[in-house]
Every structure is written in structure tokens, then in C-alpha cells.
Swiss-Prot record:
GO molecular function: acetoacetate decarboxylase activity
Record's function text: Catalyzes the conversion of acetoacetate to acetone and carbon dioxide.
UniProt protein name: Acetoacetate decarboxylase 3
EC number per UniProt: 4.1.1.4
Superkingdom to which the source organism belongs: Bacteria
Length: 256
């Protein structure tokens, strides 16, 4: 038992880290949504800055321990004690190891689905199917203008935040934490901008459309090598002090 680190005990779904990614391809479409929609899902003590969402399609052809897979989801720009970062709201992917590892280690909100990134002539197309239902379609022009590398690197180096939830065996809460993590050892290989469009459709189990698209702000397409760093707990919702402080000030945000 001294060597146990993940489930199943004798044959875990993923190895210990570090987790290095090579030629990781991103298509990120930033769009404006309603502040009310964000307030319903962003938990305290995170703060919403502008009512923006980053919808991401990510192709990971080569990663240590996790293999070859594709992912998509929504990241919300937030602040934590004055520090700007991103709250990872939803993630959908097609590989068991990063789903198990992401949920167990960090608390990534990962679900099994079928995201795709394809290059069709002069357009990059990203899609998300949950079962047979098409839930998201993103399209972007192919490499129209080179993006500012410093801005892309700064966005990659910013902190990201997660809510890690693990229930007790009796069904009650056992772990409920705000986790912060970083991407490290980043090598940006190329970065491009172009016009983009995004369509989100309702689905009961893939509710990306609950953060509606009002207008597109920007889009960036890039490739990078990077390491997914392990996390740190910055807020424990179940500690007596934090439970009292949060419930006294913003009780609705604990439930979010």
C-alpha cells in the first residue's frame, strides 16, 4: 500500500508524472457571454472580470503517460486575490487515462465524449459530439496572420483554477477544494490569428450552450510543447473557517 497512488490499486489507468506534451495544437475562440450566465457557474472566491469565455479545441498527438487524444471545453477568465487566470469550467475528451488522471489528481471537470479537430482546405474545424448529438462547432480561417508570441506565451503561463470534488463513501462531501495549477517549460512553435465562428447547442450532459455566444472577440491557433504541472490547494471549502466565511458572504456561490 505504500506505493499506491491511483486506482485500480494494482493497475492504475495512468502513471505518475511529470506529464509532457509535444506538438499540442490549440484553437481558442474567445467570445462574449452574459454576466448572469457566468455568475451562475463561477464559484467564490474567484471573481469575474469581463463576461468572456474561451472555447478551446486541443489536439494532443503525443503526451507522456496520457497518449494521443483530443479535448474541448470552456475556460472562463477570472481573478483570485488579484491574480488573473482561467477557471476551467468544462472539458470533454476521448481517452480514459487523462480523464481518470485529470479528475483524480487535479480535479479537472473531464467527461468522455468525441471532440475532433480537422483541417478542411482553408478552414480549421473543431467539433464536439456527445454520443450522436453535435454540441459544438468552431471554425477558423487557416493561418491568416501571425499572432503575437509574447501574448500567447503569457496566456499559457497564467495560472488556471479548478474545483476538485470527491465524495465520501457515505455520499457526503469528502474533498471540495479550489486548486491552482500552471503549465511549465513552454516552447511555442507557431501562433496565428484569423476570423472565427462558434455554434453551441443544448445538451443535458454537455451543457456548453449554457454560456451563450453573444459575439466573437478573437481567435488564435498555435502549437506548443509544454509540461502540465501538478497543482496546489488554495482554498478548502470544507474547512470550518472557509465554510463560515463563504456562507456568510456569498452563500449562492458555494453552490455554483
Amino acid at each position: 500500500m505504500k506505493r499506491a497512488y491511483a486506482m485500480p490499486l494494482t493497475n492504475p489507468s495512468f502513471p505518475p508524472g511529470p506529464y509532457r506534451f509535444f506538438d499540442r495544437e490549440y484553437i481558442i475562440i474567445t467570445y462574449r457571454t452574459t454576466r448572469e450566465a457566468l455568475e451562475a457557474v463561477v464559484p467564490a472566491p474567484l471573481e469575474i472580470d469581463e463576461p468572456l469565455v474561451k472555447y478551446e479545441f486541443i489536439r494532443m498527438p503525443d503526451s507522456t503517460g496520457f497518449g494521443d487524444y483530443t479535448e474541448t471545453g470552456q475556460v472562463i477568465p477570472v481573478k483570485y486575490k488579484g491574480q488573473h487566470g482561467g477557471y476551467v469550467h468544462s472539458m470533454y475528451l476521448d481517452d480514459d487515462a487523462p480523464i481518470a488522471g485529470g479528475r483524480e489528481l487535479w480535479g479537472f471537470p473531464k467527461k468522455l465524449a468525441n471532440p475532433k479537430i480537422v483541417h478542411e482546405g482553408e478552414v480549421i474545424v473543431g467539433t464536439l459530439h456527445y454520443g450522436s448529438v453535435l454540441c459544438a462547432t468552431g471554425t477558423m480561417g487557416y493561418k491568416h496572420r501571425e499572432a503575437d508570441h509574447d501574448s500567447v506565451l503569457a496566456s499559457l503561463a497564467a495560472p488556471n483554477f479548478l474545483i476538485k470534488i470527491i465524495p465520501h463513501v457515505d455520499g457526503g462531501p469528502r474533498i471540495c477544494e479550489l486548486v491552482r495549477y500552471y503549465l511549465t517549460d513552454i516552447t511555442l512553435k507557431e501562433a496565428w490569428t484569423a476570423p472565427a465562428a462558434l455554434d453551441l447547442r443544448p445538451h443535458v450532459m454537455a451543457d456548453v450552450a449554457k454560456l451563450p455566444v453573444l459575439d466573437i472577440i478573437s481567435a488564435v491557433h498555435f502549437k506548443a510543447d509544454l509540461t502540465l504541472g501538478l497543482g496546489e490547494v488554495v482554498h478548502d471549502y470544507l474547512s470550518d473557517h472557509n465554510r463560515l466565511a463563504t456562507s456568510t458572504t456569498q452563500p449562492e456561490k458555494i453552490r455554483a
